[in-house]
Amino acid sequence: MRRKIVVGNWKMNNSVAESVQLATDVLAALGEGFSGCEVGIAPTYLALDATEKVIAESEVQLVAQNCHYENDGAFTGEVSARMILAVGCSSVIIGHSERRQYFGETNATVNLRIKKALSEGLNVILCVGETLAERESGVMETVISSQVREGLDGIIDISAIVIAYEPVWAIGTGKTASSAQAEEVHLFIRTLVTGLYGQTASEKVRIQYGGSVKPSNAAELFAMPNIDGGLIGGASLNADDFAAIVKAASV
């Protein structure tokens, strides 16, 4: 049975002090109620070190929001996998739709970043998902298939990879794919993984849902057989809401 995983992506929110406070509040809100679920939080780069100190003695994992595909060099504004590993990150989010939309990330650069992160010993959350236009024009499966196949190109072992399905039209909009809609895509992704890596690997890979997950809909989403947790945006900025989502995944 796959252990569910819930990660709070704080995006470009919170100062270092605010991140420390939120991490403290998250630990308090979680209490002992998440033993059945893997939990991570992803603050900004600036707050990684300070946040790590707060969660160091807990089971909550430190996650980075991105990393570059080179170790160092003339890449102004970028941060390498080695750098985030050095401050205590165990995982990194790669290919988030906002990176693709606003910063020109492609399947090819996502693939490079994944390979570098894996080579440094990090776990990876690979984000895939379609826009509303792509869904309505009937190319959703083509888009997601390309993101999965090209993102994982040349990667033999996916045991350290989690896939996050994030319908772009549901991110930060308040709209949520129904549990049936989300399950349909998660099953499609798992079928893709079966074709690429075989049945055993596809049964083990965890596929998160990310798209306006809230305490009010988390339990229904997480009850679906192919939804293995969530990549949480806005709701992760409220400790009580995030804890409620984690507990819904811990049942």
UniProtKB/Swiss-Prot annotation:
Protein name, entry field: Triosephosphate isomerase
Pathway stated in the Swiss-Prot or TrEMBL entry: Carbohydrate biosynthesis; gluconeogenesis; Carbohydrate degradation; glycolysis; D-glyceraldehyde 3-phosphate from glycerone phosphate: step 1/1
Similarity remark: Belongs to the triosephosphate isomerase family.
Keywords linked to the UniProt accession: Cytoplasm, Gluconeogenesis, Glycolysis, Isomerase
An example Gene Ontology molecular-function term: triose-phosphate isomerase activity
Binding partners and assembly: Homodimer.
GO CC term (a single one): cytosol
Group of enzyme by EC: isomerase
EC identifiers of the protein: 5.3.1.1
Natural source organism: Pelodictyon phaeoclathratiforme (strain DSM 5477 / BU-1)
Its job: Involved in the gluconeogenesis. Catalyzes stereospecifically the conversion of dihydroxyacetone phosphate (DHAP) to D-glyceraldehyde-3-phosphate (G3P).
Gene3D superfamilies xref list: Aldolase class I (3.20.20.70)
Binding residues annotated for substrate, in chain numbering: 9-11, 172, 212, 233-234
Phylogenetic lineage: Bacteria, Pseudomonadati, Chlorobiota, Chlorobiia, Chlorobiales
Gene name tied to this protein: tpiA
Protein's GO biological process: gluconeogenesis; glyceraldehyde-3-phosphate biosynthetic process; glycerol catabolic process; glycolytic process
Catalysed reaction, written as an equation: D-glyceraldehyde 3-phosphate = dihydroxyacetone phosphate
Active site per the UniProt annotation: 96, 166
